[in-house]
């Protein structure tokens, strides 16, 4: 009788010990947040319809990524803080611990995955915006770009793609691509409208927004490539927050929460995804 009680007591104690060791591990991610009770998202509000200021250059940050990251925070029972950050400073801010997550229309890329964890959420791909009539007959990132002038956002994956094509052009004896890199997408658009470049390489969602605002002057080149690229949210490498975010994003996609946000900003909910191949 006493031996049975002893066994039961030991078993209960063992379970309690195991639960005690598991519970803190599950809560560690909250202890590591930049601000207690808040999910801080580094975001570059210069990229409609993904993220932009409600008043153009000031006010509340809105857009698909802003709303989706807010939905994520709500799912995790946290407040959301949108921390406006320059494009080239997004990943450095994350690795320096100034934000918990970077949810702001960044490609899932090997370069970024080398220093951060990525959680895919939307299929996308680059496109080319050109002057109406496409006078240089550019179709995509291909030999059609050799000898042309192309604008890109500096430090973006698209910049890397165009630089790679420039090398291919030159290695095959063709004229290279004159690449102009700008800090902001709006500056690439201004360069195209002012005739300084022949085309802009941007994500498909940005291309659509650019053309919608300049329908009489610009168009999307007929051609597409790398259609299986994904946008991804980034978290510090090896963080306890990563699996939490991944699970929450999967839930928000499966229950239709993020699909409603996509429709709100005229994005295709069929492109929502939880997997992706890095470029």
Question: Where are the model-predicted features located?
Answer:
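Ligand-binding clefts/hinges and TM-proximal coupling segments of bilobed small-molecule sensing domains
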Residues: 28-31, 157-177, 219-220, 250-279
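Bilobed "Venus flytrap"/periplasmic-binding protein-like clamshell domains
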Residues: 43-48, 59-74, 106, 127-184, ...
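Acidic, polar ligand-binding/catalytic clefts
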Residues: 70, 79-143
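Extracytoplasmic small-molecule ligand-binding "clamshell" domains
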Residues: 27-105, 264
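A structural signal for short loop-to-beta-strand junctions that line the ligand-binding cleft
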Residues: 30, 60-65, 112-124, 219-224, ...
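Periplasmic-binding protein-like
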Residues: 45, 123-130, 212-250, 268-279
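A ligand-binding cleft/hinge motif common to bilobed small-molecule-binding domains
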Residues: 88-89, 105-114, 163-164, 193, ...
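Extended ligand-binding regions for polar small-molecule ligands
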Residues: 66-75, 134, 147-149, 154-156, ...
């Amino acid at each position: 009788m006493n031996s049975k009680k002893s066994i039961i007591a030991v078993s209960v104690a063992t379970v309690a010990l195991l639960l005690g060791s598991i519970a803190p591990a599950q809560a560690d991610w909250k202890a590591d947040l930049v601000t207690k009770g808040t999910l801080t998202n580094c975001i570059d509000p210069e990229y409609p319809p993904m993220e932009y200021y409600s008043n153009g250059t000031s006010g509340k940050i809105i857009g698909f990524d802003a709303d989706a990251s807010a939905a994520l925070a709500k799912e995790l029972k946290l407040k959301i803080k949108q921390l406006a950050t320059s494009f080239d400073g997004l990943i450095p801010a994350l690795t320096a611990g100034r934000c918990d997550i970077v949810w702001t229309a960044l490609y899932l890329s090997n370069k970024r995955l080398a220093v951060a964890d990525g959680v895919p959420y939307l299929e996308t791909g680059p496109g080319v915006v050109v002057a109406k009539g496409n006078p240089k007959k550019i179709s995509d990132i291909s030999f059609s770009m050799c000898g042309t002038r192309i604008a890109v956002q500096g430090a973006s994956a698209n910049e890397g793609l165009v630089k790679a094509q420039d090398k291919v052009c030159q290695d095959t004896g063709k004229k290279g691509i004159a690449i102009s890199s700008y800090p902001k997408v709006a500056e690439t658009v201004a360069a195209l409208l002012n005739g300084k470049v022949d085309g802009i390489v941007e994500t498909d969602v940005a291309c659509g927004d650019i053309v919608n605002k300049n329908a009489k002057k610009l168009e999307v080149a007929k051609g597409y490539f790398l259609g299986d690229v994904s946008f991804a949210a980034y978290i510090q490498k090896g963080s306890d927050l990563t699996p939490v975010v991944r699970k929450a994003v999967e839930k928000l996609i499966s229950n239709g929460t993020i699909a409603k946000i996509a429709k709100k900003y005229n994005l295709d909910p069929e492109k929502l995804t939880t997997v992706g191949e890095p470029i």
